[in-house]
């Protein structure tokens, strides 16, 4: 079967093609979709390559939101001064695959794929990320936490494109942290993922904490049960609590790695929290507006 290839230069053109050409799929990084095509899991009639849409290839902070375009790669995130000021996000971006994969893979693609073990998607969940979705009918803004319907299933419609991801610009009273545990040291799919975003008062005590967990159940999830428990605690107290408290939201599935996940989940949360608190203690955290 012949597969048509489209290479739009504008977002509106891509949205029109997606609406008009039945059976087509989008490709930006392609690290997930190309594997599915090669394995015969999907047989599209057409491929819409949106990598040439330059308006979706920027990272900016306007003081209200950090904006990450739908075509931005993990390598771009690693090199971005904007992402570099958000320690948990920078660490998550650098944890994805290998250097070669990070040059092409995108967080937008991983969010859309909804793999349970997607590194950066789990961290972005803790940052309260919103997706700006575009179709021929206009824009729709939806919170990342609301799109997941199950493993590899989302509420993103077949005619919608992730124009950008955005989350609130962090201030000097906020810190972020990220941890992943796997059996091998490199290029292994994460078995446990934890993201943390904390807001502290002038004495370094926790005012609020958002914890995200990935690779433990069908989708990445938030864990408010632990976030509520560490309110009012300082760094050391919060870490000690995290090491002892297993969040109910983890909901571990039966799997070969279940015992490993039971033994390491609390450690991952504690590590992410430690990094987040440490980020608030550094005096150089002025999240100035910037761009890639």
Residue ranges of model-derived segments:
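A glycine-rich beta-strand to alpha-helix segment
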Residues: 276-292
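C-terminal structural segment of proteins
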Residues: 1-274
């Amino acid at each position: 079967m012949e597969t048509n290839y489209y290479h739009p230069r504008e977002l509106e053109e891509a949205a029109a093609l997606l609406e008009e050409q039945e059976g087509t799929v989008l490709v930006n990084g392609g690290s997930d979709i190309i594997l599915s095509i090669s394995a015969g899991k999907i047989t599209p009639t057409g491929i819409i390559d949106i990598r040439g849409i330059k308006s979706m290839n920027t990272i900016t902070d306007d003081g209200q939101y950090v904006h990450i375009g739908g075509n931005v790669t993990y390598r771009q995130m690693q090199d971005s001064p904007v992402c570099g000021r958000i320690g948990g996000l920078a660490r998550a971006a650098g944890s994805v695959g290998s250097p070669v994969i990070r040059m092409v893979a995108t967080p937008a693609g991983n969010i859309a794929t909804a793999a349970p073990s997607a590194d950066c998607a789990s961290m972005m969940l803790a940052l309260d990320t919103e997706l700006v979705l575009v179709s021929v009918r206009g824009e729709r803004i939806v919170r990342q936490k609301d799109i997941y319907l199950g493993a590899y299933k989302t509420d993103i419609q077949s005619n919608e494109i992730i124009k950008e991801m955005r989350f609130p610009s962090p201030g000097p009273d906020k810190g972020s942290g990220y941890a992943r545990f796997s059996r091998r040291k490199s290029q292994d799919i994460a078995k446990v993922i934890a993201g943390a975003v904390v807001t502290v008062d002038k004495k370094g005590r926790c005012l609020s904490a958002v914890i995200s967990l990935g690779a433990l159940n069908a989708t990445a999830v938030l864990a408010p049960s632990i976030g509520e428990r560490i309110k009012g605690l300082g760094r050391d107290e919060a870490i000690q609590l995290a090491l002892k408290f297993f969040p109910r939201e983890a909901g571990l599935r039966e799997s070969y790695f279940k015992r490993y996940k039971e033994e390491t989940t609390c450690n991952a949360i504690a590590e992410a929290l430690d990094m987040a608190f440490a980020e608030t203690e550094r005096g150089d955290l002025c999240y100035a507006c910037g761009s890639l």
